Amino acid sequence: MSASTNRRRLKDINTGAGENPSSGKKPLRSVTPLPISSKNSNPALQKSLSSKENPNPKLSHRSFGSTQKPVLRPVPRIDKSAVSGEGRVTRSTSSGLRGRSSSPSDLIRVFSDLRKRNESRVIGEKGESGQDKKSGLKSSGFKQGTSEIKVEPSSVCEKADEGSSCPVNSSKFEGSSVARNSISDPKAHALVGSGEKSTVALKSDSKIEKTGKGTSVALRRKSLDNVGKAMEMSKDIRGNEGSSNSTAKYPSKLHEKLAFLEGKVKKIASDIKKTKDMLDLNNPDSSKVIISDIHQKITGIEKSMSHVIDGPEKNKTTKAKSSVKGLNKEELEDRLLPHQRLLRSRTQSKTSSHVSKGHDSVESNKAVNAEEKPSAPVEENAIALEFLASLDKEKVTFMSDQNALENLEVQEMDTEEPSKENDVSKDVNLTSNLTEILRANEALEEIDDEENREEMELEEIDDGCMYQLNDIGSKTSTGGWFVSEGEAVILAHDDGSCSYYDVANSEFMVNECNSLSIWVRLYEVTGVFGFVHYVKSVYSPPDGISPNTWRDCWVVRAPGADGCSGRYVVAASAGNTLESGFCSWDFYTKDIKALHIEDGSSRVSRTALAPLPNNTSHGRNTPACAVVPETQQWWYRPCGPLIASTGSFQSIVKVFDIRDGEQIMKWGVQNPVSALDYSSPLQWRNRGKLVIAETEAISVWDVNSLHPEAQHTISSSGRKISAFHINNTDAEVGGGVRQRVSSLDAEGNDGVFCTSDSINILDFRNPSGIGAKIPKLGVNAQCVSSRGDSVFLGCTNQKSTVKKQMASSSQVQQFSIRKQRLVSTYSLPDSNSHPHHSAITQVWGNSNFVMATSGMGLFVFDTAKEETLQQQPLTSDYGSVQTVREIIGPNDMYCPSFDYSGCRVLLISRDRPALWRYLL
């Protein structure tokens, strides 16, 4: 036929085609051509018709006769760039026909391009006549937008009389086949593509046609039946798609369950890994040491059970032995490592639950697996299959250890029963194994008894260690106090250096690092227990300093040269020394900031001083702080950036700057400074006021005043001052007994001083300076401290009367400022030592404890409660008598002092290292 005839017919068809009723939607792509008659023998025409898209639905009603020539449909334009770049055909946004090509050459070029790129190739396989043939559609160039089964809601046409086509897009129709040339078969639903994408077009006349390379197959059904079946099929596919697209991913339920099991296995593996990491983090070296000890203890069990594996049932007895040994180890772990045992049990329970679920699912699907095998490869589920195969192979059950025979049995699937001879040998082996197991249990019981005894001993040791005195360092300490809320200690040493120890952190490190084992080994070697302390800072002594120069030390806060707050360590003389002076270090850099040595201090005779520092034995056997009368003493007291200095029997008071050692001011007092035995005559009321104890008066000086004169002078009525204490509201915070006093506690109670017949409460608001005067009878005051309403007086009883047995030679008396009388007496045990050795050198008390120290040790009392004071009758001289609660430290201490903060007590003796312990 001529080209003009073809153009005319195509034009007529285009003019009569009309608009597509579904022009508002983007047409679904279909590679299935219009059905053509099998009588048509023109291969070129068949090829051209197989490449068309958007066929005219009205031509589906036209009957094809033998004399009728085939009709060419208009070919849509194809975007070559899209074909070459992405393998997709650019489709029209309208379902209507856009017309034919501009020329036959364009049509030929389109066909050649499609042929070259294999963009829509339909392969059909021919078989023998009379047999069914398998067919598939291969679309390598045209890719679907999705890889799952998709059936559009508009894919089935419900109105058959309109004659519109209803395409159905489908992909991955696996596991099914279509019988070709069987028109009457109503069960042919889809085309098998072997995992590749295919397209099925369901039309109103129930024609499903598939065109191959030169062959065509027509599957015909009745309209109503096919439309109903198509709708049912679309609903089924949509339902399967809503349930996680399991049909698209897995060809059968077995594959779906295997994939589910694989996910469970991976989750279990990840949980095990996380648990292992957690155990590694919670398994320090100490746990390894404990585990190694357990391993050594069960070595005897392993040796006794080693010959079990030599029998004919080697594998079974080995597994049983491991279970028995593991059972014993679990018992040990339950007692020694409960946290690790808990984590392991939780992990095993999760694993067993997942395994049981997976095994049940496999057994339920054995019949399906035997009859039906998946068409797709299952290499991706190899882990799950291997895991399930191992479960099907054998099932091992371990019974309780009540019956040893059951504990040695291993149940295997699909195995033959053993012979009678094997049964006889098995009974013999089981009998011997049972004997060994019983012996192992006896050995374990002995081990448990030994460990229980060790635990009881360790508990006793732990309790004793809590209340044991512990040395701090190895240097002899001449003074020291708690700082930083009792967590650290500042010490002054006999060599002129100072050290800063972090007591709290040192004991924590020991407790965390196998403290019990360290204490046990230390006890085996030395016979004593103790804490290991680590010095944080050491402040080196200045050059040329004499031994035993420092007897007191502080940590002081003061603004630096740059205006920022700084910290300084200050050490100074206190009482009798060969040399007198002070030294300050920067707390952080440890550099010496100031050093001052008194010029005339070296002229003091040695005979008036304490024993030489190197003669330790002499110092322990002599009276505590034996002071020769009328011996000059030097005292230093800091407050903020200033430190005051004076000497007994002198009338000069100097003030220095601790940051550079420069002298700030110099005063002259009216009376010489008093020589006190156990109290400093130089004390601060706050940063602006300095209080000095003179021989017959108390003077108050203002360091901020331009006129060097006393602001207030309080007379002692001609009596000698024996003890002196001032409440400092600007003292350092975080300390112990020398911690600053609150303004509320110091209101009306600026301090206290004692004379031979009375206790005088200082109140600088009164013109006389004395707020209250409490008489004291028959005692010689040695030291005093004040806190709130209470005044604690350390004294020696010199009264010898019939009531002498009611009071010891040394005692602590508690007075009430509000009641202005004696409320309680705390008696120290009687001693035959020298009076100076048994004299109380320091006293302090609060609402819980009353403490007093002498050469006999530190004596701790429970503070008398208000209820107790009301119930007990008061004697005229001593009030309620309280007995000592406990004595801390040795009885040969030299010039002792103490400090208390929180739950720790610090004890200083100037002939040995500092001591501390808990006090609860």
Swiss-Prot record:
Disulfide-bond pairs as recorded: none
Major location category of this protein: cytoplasm
Origin superkingdom: Eukaryota
GO CC terms, sorted: cytoplasm
Segments of skewed composition (Basic residues): 1-10
SUPFAM superfamilies, per the entry: YVTN repeat-like/Quinoprotein amine dehydrogenase
Complex formation: Interacts with KIN14B, CDKA-1, CKS1 and CKS2.
Protein name as annotated: KIN14B-interacting protein At4g14310
Organism whose genome encodes this protein: Arabidopsis thaliana (Mouse-ear cress)
